[in-house]
A protein has these predicted regions:
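Conserved acetyl-CoA-binding loop-helix of GNAT-fold acetyltransferases
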Residues: 106, 112-125, 152
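Conserved active-site alpha-helix within GNAT-family acetyltransferase domains
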Residues: 117, 129, 141-159
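Conserved GNAT-fold acetyl-CoA-binding loop/helix
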Residues: 36-61
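Conserved GNAT acetyl-CoA-binding A-motif
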Residues: 120, 127-139
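A short helix-loop-beta-strand connector motif used in the catalytic cores of GNAT acetyltransferases and
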Residues: 61-73, 100
Length: 168
């Protein structure tokens, strides 16, 4: 489904009162809500344990260093429905900058409404416009639902184990 409003990845404007849910960059003021979303994600993984201090510190590092990564949120008015964080690195295989996409999480009350697809579409558009060469993500091995979602978004399995989407 096509998102009703798609704001610019570089926009720092917050949603207007009558705006439908849309994607925009997170701000430092969003840190408490982002921390809650990441802690929820960590609590559902066998590989991680939620730790408010660690999650908040990691999110703050990304927010304070936009040259190293970005966090985007699905926002409606003053409520955050979901988030994704992107970390930037260089790939010698692709000969350019690539993205490691992490913490794709939608609040439990808002799952199944297209917000995950809205976020990933936004990330792909951002990556293309900024000339990134690939988006790589790690998804839980045991979560067939998560893997199917990302396959529908154009990601594929690689021989290196993570899933990825090549950006042309």
């Amino acid at each position: 489904t096509t998102p009703p409003v798609k704001s610019s990845p570089d926009s720092q404007n917050s949603a207007l009162v009558d705006d439908p849910p849309h994607v925009e960059p997170a701000t430092i003021e969003d840190l408490p809500a982002l921390t809650e979303l990441v802690m929820d994600l960590m609590s559902r993984s066998d590989d991680f344990s939620p730790d408010r201090e660690l999650q908040e510190r990691g999110l703050r590092l990304i927010l304070e260093q936009p040259n190293r990564g970005r966090i985007f949120v699905v926002r409606n008015k003053d409520k955050i429905f979901g988030m994704v964080n992107l970390l930037f690195t260089i790939s010698t295989a692709r000969g350019g900058f690539v993205i490691l996409m992490e913490d794709v999480v939608i609040h439990p009350d808002h799952r199944g409404q297209g917000y995950g697809a809205m976020l990933t579409d936004y990330v792909v558009d951002f990556a293309r416009r900024k000339n990134f060469k690939r988006i790589t993500l790690l998804t839980d091995r045991m979560s067939a639902e998560s893997q199917e979602f990302f396959k529908k978004q154009g990601f594929e399995y690689s021989n290196m184990i993570p899933m990825r989407r090549i950006i042309d």
